Amino acid sequence: MSNGPITRTVRQALILDLLEQNQVSSQMQLSELLKQRGVDITQGTLSRDLDELGAKKIRPNGGRAFYAVGTSEDAASSTTAGTREKLRKMLDDLLVSVDHSGNIAVLRTPPAGAPFLASFIDRVGMDEVVGTIAGDDTVFVLARDPMTGKELGEFLSQRRTSL
C-alpha cells in the first residue's frame, strides 16, 4: 500500500479483498489485517465502512461466524441502480485517465488503486467486458466483440459522470 492517505473507495476495496481472502470474525481482527497492509483505521470508520459495503456476519451450518459481503441472498436482492452507483463512485475516485489499443481499454489510477478497480469491474459482470488485468496503477480491460477498446474506454469515462 502507498505511504500517502488513501481514499474511502480504495480503503473499502481493500476491506472487500480482505473479507474475500480471510474468514474475519471481528472488527478487531479486520483492523489488524488493515494495519498489516499499512492502513490505520478507527473502529467507527471501520464500522461505517462495513455497513456501507453491506458486510454481514454469517454463520454457515452453525459454525464460527465471520463477515461476508454479497452472499447469494444479497446478490438476489441487490439492484442494478446500486451497482451502477458503486461503479460510478469507484470510477470517480480512482480513474485518472483512459487510453486504448485495439480491443483493450487502458485505465490509469492513483498508485495502488488498479487492483481494486479491476476487481470491482470483474465483480459487476458488465456485458461489455471480457475481463481485466491490473498492475499497481494500470488496468487493462478487454472489450467484448464487437466493442473496441476506444469505445469501452469512452463508455467507462461516460459512466463516471452520467450515473
UniProtKB/Swiss-Prot annotation:
Pathway given in the UniProt record: Amino-acid biosynthesis; L-arginine biosynthesis [regulation]
Intracellular or extracellular location(s): Cytoplasm
One record GO biological process: L-arginine biosynthetic process
Cystine pairings recorded for this chain: none
Main subcellular location of this protein, as a coarse class: cytoplasm
Pfam family, one: Arg_repressor_C
GO MF: arginine binding; DNA binding; DNA-binding transcription factor activity
InterPro entries, per database record: Arg_repress, Arg_repress_C, Arg_repress_C_sf, Arg_repress_DNA-bd, WH-like_DNA-bd_sf, WH_DNA-bd_sf
HAMAP family per the UniProt record, alphabetical: Arg_repressor (MF_00173)
NCBIfam families named in the record: argR_whole, PRK03341.1
Function: Regulates arginine biosynthesis genes.
Protein known as: Arginine repressor
